[in-house]
């Protein structure tokens, strides 16, 4: 199986039945996600971001990845990521789909539409939706919904114009 296979099997077993929602920090859901991420870290997936087979690893974790996706960031172990065809996710994008706020642990899905581009070091928080043909500038933080064909930037990200695709 190898390290990646063990990480996938472990994460899928640990996170079976996990749903988007708000949970207690340090509670069973939080600890299950934490342990699944430690397994993924130990597998070396983070070091292989950008490798062609990373898309297959993402799919094995339960994420929905379209054809022709250019994935340069580690996928979430939760399996709650959906990326449309021909989209691009640059390096070091936070796709984890969870965050801690005080004593609460928030988990949610992330949706990236077809032909969208996510700039390097961007954070997509749980529940973030990036529409088709949309662009998000590097270093942005997307909290809500980026509509189709829009260009967003900043932290928190705000609309800055129309997306420019070649």
Describe each model-derived feature in a short phrase.
Residues 1-61, 150, 155-166:
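Terminal amphipathic alpha-helical/low-complexity segments used for targeting or macromolecular assembly
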Residues 58-60, 64-159:
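Structural signal for interior beta-strand "rungs" in well-ordered beta-sheet cores
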